[in-house]
Amino acid sequence: MDRRDAMALSGSGSYYIQRGIPGSGPPPPQTQPTFHGSQGFHHFTNSISPFGSNPNPNPNPGGVSTGFVSPPLPVDSSPADSSAAAAGALVAPPSGDTSVKRKRGRPRKYGQDGGSVSLALSPSISNVSPNSNKRGRGRPPGSGKKQRLSSIGEMMPSSTGMSFTPHVIVVSIGEDIASKVISFSHQGPRAICVLSASGAVSTATLLQPAPSHGTIIYEGLFELISLSTSYLNTTDNDYPNRTGSLAVSLASPDGRVIGGGIGGPLIAASQVQVIVGSFIWAIPKGKIKKREETSEDVQDTDALENNNDNTAATSPPVPQQSQNIVQTPVGIWSTGSRSMDMHHPHMDIDLMRG
């Protein structure tokens, strides 16, 4: 019994290649050869039937071409090949579009590539600020008590200009503008200065230049351009004793401008508004003396510290009593070791001892 006949069982399927018959019609589309399995599980013997040939080698004059007709070739396959082919025909390859199911449970500590996943926590953006500058300790500069300004002459040794307050002085028709401003300046120890004024003047008494030292009276209707003055106290708690003067600039109806220091009454021809500012310009002497004393004490302590530093830097070093070393040239014996014996009378050195 042949080996192939023994392996070919009645239950094994046979496969054959289906070929088209040439000349039987239009050529079919080119397709790859497919394997078809018989549904009836029939077995074909390994017999080779002779191929038939067309006796007329010339083509058909009617236009129908004939060719070789071959019967289907039996294909003997081993059980392993048949099982593999059956598995390939029944099982379809998985498509690439199928989504991978996510496994349940805690994710793996290590990734697919075998590398370890970093477990370090990254700082949150809200907690980390790009410009996180530490605030200095103590009170920020400029938030403490108001400091004194530099001295402005002998009349104002400690001017600060604190507590500036604006005021409005209303002068009725026929009243003296200059006397109103002066009386307002005597109401308290505060210094005043005129910021602006508006209205009309009927009579103005102005001072002449220095050589004559006289006054000139102007009568008519004059427009008030500007009014400037400042009244300051010369001494503390002495209200009437003030320094300052008034100056005015007027415009006549014909376009002329006159002005100068006020040496007499300045009568208002209409309602005049004068804007005045008052401020505290001086500090009591007691506070000044205390601050000066404290500043002098600080300067004295600084000077003492500087002197101590200078003396410490210039004073020669004090030799230590425990050591008495005398530098001598090489090859010369010195008697400096005797002083060591004098400092230590109880020391006994025996050179014979080993």
From Swiss-Prot:
Compositionally skewed regions (Polar residues) per UniProt: 304-327
UniProt KW keywords: DNA-binding, Nucleus, Repeat, Transcription, Transcription regulation
Compositional bias (Low complexity): 46-55, 75-96, 122-133
SMART domains recorded: AT_hook (SM00384)
Disordered: region residues: 1-158, 290-354
UniProt short sequence motif Bipartite nuclear localization signal, positions renumbered to this chain: 101-109
Annotated InterPro entries: AHL, AT_hook_DNA-bd_motif, PPC_dom
Residue ranges with Basic and acidic residues bias: 340-354
Biased segments, Acidic residues type: 294-303
Location of the PPC domain: 159-302
Localization, UniProt: Nucleus
DNA-binding region: 101-113, 134-146
Major localization class: nucleus
Annotated Gene Ontology cellular component terms: nucleus
Protein purpose: Transcription factor that specifically binds AT-rich DNA sequences related to the nuclear matrix attachment regions (MARs).
Domain remarks: The PPC domain mediates interactions between AHL proteins.
Protein name: AT-hook motif nuclear-localized protein 11
Organism listed in the record: Arabidopsis thaliana
Lineage: Eukaryota, Viridiplantae, Streptophyta, Embryophyta, Tracheophyta
